[in-house]
Amino acid sequence: GRGADGHEKRDSETTSTLSTTDTPGHGDFITTSSSPNDWRSPQNDNLWQGVDGVNNPCPVGFRLPTEAEWEAERTSWDSNDSAGAFGSPLKLPVAGYRGVDGSLYGVGSYGGYWSSSVDGASARGLGFVSSDAGMGSDYRAGGVSVRCLKD
């Protein structure tokens, strides 16, 4: 699982001070209310690429899946929705997400998982609800789950 730096907790303390470095040095969830809704200023598009990615949330020897890898996983499900996600070998739950304001949303109804891919000012991730699933772009300051792949 994710390293224990405070960011693995869904109820960690919050701060509105954006980080100017790739590693904030604390476990607080960084909130924001202005564009581009990133926890870091300036943005860095190369934080989570590969096992040696800066600020890689995965343990040593593991990495986040790419958008293409998540898409391949999604298309293997029996159904394109949260039931398919949980019915897959990964047993992906609808854990909800943490908004850029630090609040929890969608617990029990939405599942979201970061990829290592970016799209302009946004991060790419897999999302699903009871009626649909697919890749989407989300604010980098938001918080969704991670699943790590052994490299």
Model-derived regions, located:
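C-terminal, surface-exposed recognition/capping segments
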Residues: 4-5, 31-32, 36-56, 60-151
